[in-house]
Amino acid sequence: MYAYEQLPEDIDAIDMLVIMGGPQSPATTKEECPSFDAAAECACIARAIKAKKLVIGVCLGAQLVGETLGGRFEHSPEKEIGKFPIFLTEAGKNDPLFSLFGDSLDVGHWHSDMPGLTDAAIVIAKSGGCPRQIIRYQDFVYGFQCHMEFTTEVVRGLVQASRDELSASASLRFVQPVETLLTQDYQEMNQKLYHFLDALTTEYQRRTT
């Protein structure tokens, strides 16, 4: 779904809920962005979690998952725009779903906030600028602050829409220049994301059928 489209009401009709990113934050109001309703999105996420569905949040989506479960989003120590390594924690290294990630993996980033943590949350990966890059909130509920779904085409669109932001952030240590963003190879992280999703859905089917 996209701007102004209705959130799914029949959770039983879906198997997986993926909540993507955007320029907003969980604190953005409807007055500031009429097409975005954080409370309604969190309610939808809560229904999916209660129904034991697969739930994955990406960037803003990860922050909304955290908010739904009681973990308040925060500003990241560093703004990150570009392709930088994430480093798996011991929990991440021991999680078979991330077996192809190795100790570290270069992935996409475009954020200045990060998801909140709950008492049950486990940090799977962190980066040089953000201590909460991948979070397992509970079985089959994950938050990815990073963007492993980036492709050159996606990044080109983001660059075209974010010239002012990129110019204002150019001096920051975890913000790469446009030329670098557009010439990065995003295929390895894409393949690792596919492997994670395949492994996750296989395990979900094994435990729910």
Language-model segments: what does each one mean?
Residues C33-D37, F73-E74, K126, Q160-S162:
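Glycine-rich, phosphate-binding/catalytic loops in enzymes
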Residues C42-A46, F98, Y194-L197:
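Short amphipathic alpha-helical segments and helix-helix/interface helices
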Residues M148-T209:
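Acyltransferase
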Residues L69-E153:
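Pocket-forming structural segment of enzyme catalytic cores
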Residues M1-I56:
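Flexible gly/pro-rich beta->alpha loop and the following alpha-helix that scaffold active-site loops
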Residues A48-R72:
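Catalytic nucleophile loop
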Residues I11-D12, Y137, V154-L158:
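Short aromatic-enriched loop/helix-cap "lid" or pocket-rim segments at secondary-structure transitions
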Residues G22-P23, A62, S112, M148:
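Active-site metal-binding loops of divalent metal-dependent hydrolases
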